[in-house]
């Protein structure tokens, strides 16, 4: 069973990348991205949109299942690498990427966030969260991903903070303390947006 669901996720993400529409070119030759707000309606529909993977588990039930059928048992052997991105950060890569409006958002160990063109892998922006020198990490420096909602990207950090970034630029919108890292608190989880309560958990 474990192998089956992993293949399902892999096939779904590859199908998702293949299904992404081409973006228009701006006058300066750069791609233009039509960043629509990630509304509660979009989040509730989960994987209904074949061009998006809007949260860690795909939907609020965290099924991690994609209904796309482009990749199957017969043609999976024909897949080839479309692009590759290396973070350059030591440690494990345990994050599940999220995709919205042609942009893939990914985290690496030590709280680095990347926005990549989902079609080409081209880096669009990067955020490096400053960690304190006296940080005590109990169980490794991994981060398991981001949440997106409206025009923001959310990440929980090793020093027990919740950071909101602008989806378009990667600039910090706000940065708030969850608890005191000096008391041993930390967070590696991918946040979840609970819109009816207007909160990020």
How would you label these PLM feature ranges?
Residues 55, 106-107, 155-156:
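Conserved beta-strand element within WD40/beta-propeller blades
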Residues 28-87, 122-135, 171-180:
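Aromatic (tryptophan-biased) beta-strands that constitute blades/sheets of beta-rich domains
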Residues 198-201:
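Conserved small/polar residues in nucleotide/adenosyl-binding loops
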